[in-house]
């Protein structure tokens, strides 16, 4: 029988040299490309979102009644100006969720520079991808769909909570009066479900200030 601690120790010894080699290559890269090092530090700065507190433009809104999903879309684009590593998308509902980052292009295998992800109609996979992006680090991802479809996200959203992964969920159309789509699109019990989930922080803003 081999103990887990022994296996762990052996792995540390085995992998020490490759790690040191990688660190040396990274240090050389940073020295050669200081502007990329600055960008790297910015992308891994966990205090970056706090800079929004002192951003007057971020807090200014037109004082008139507006749909909260429109305000949410405006908010995402304001955040994008200050937080360059904001990255995400919707489950084939971006025009309705208002989650498109304007002027940022679409992320695809043909173009890695885009910041808008098109997940398709697959809420569960989208949530898993979002968790993976957070765990990898370097980006602040968000995922979006209609609130009622959080049912399809639930098993993986629960894993977000268990891992304490700060994935951002943008869940719009939180109303029993969503119009022509009828009762299949009217969220009733979903709010209670998410609020009952440990480590899942639910914010339900009613206007621009909130």
List where the protein language model places each region:
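Single conserved hydrophobic/aromatic residue that forms the stacking wall/gate
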Residues: 1-12
């Amino acid at each position: 029988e081999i103990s887990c601690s022994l296996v762990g120790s052996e792995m540390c010894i085995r992998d020490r040299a490759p790690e040191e080699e990688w660190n040396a290559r990274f240090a050389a890269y940073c020295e050669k490309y200081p502007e990329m090092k600055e960008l790297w530090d910015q992308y891994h700065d966990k205090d970056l979102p706090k800079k929004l507190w002192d951003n007057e433009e971020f807090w200014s809104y037109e004082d008139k009644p507006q749909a909260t999903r429109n305000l949410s879309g405006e908010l995402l684009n304001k955040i994008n100006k200050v937080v360059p590593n904001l990255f995400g998308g919707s489950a084939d509902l971006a025009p309705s969720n208002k989650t498109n980052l304007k002027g940022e292009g679409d992320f695809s295998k043909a173009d890695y520079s885009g910041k808008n992800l098109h997940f398709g109609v697959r809420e569960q996979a989208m949530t898993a991808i979002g968790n993976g992006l957070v765990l990898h680090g370097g980006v602040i991802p968000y995922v979006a769909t209609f609130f009622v479809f959080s049912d399809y996200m639930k098993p993986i959203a629960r894993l977000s909570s268990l891992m304490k992964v700060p994935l951002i969920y943008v869940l719009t159309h939180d109303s029993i009066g969503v119009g022509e789509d009828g009762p299949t699109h009217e969220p009733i019990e979903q709010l209670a479900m998410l609020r009952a989930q440990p480590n899942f922080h639910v914010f339900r803003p009613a206007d621009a200030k909130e």
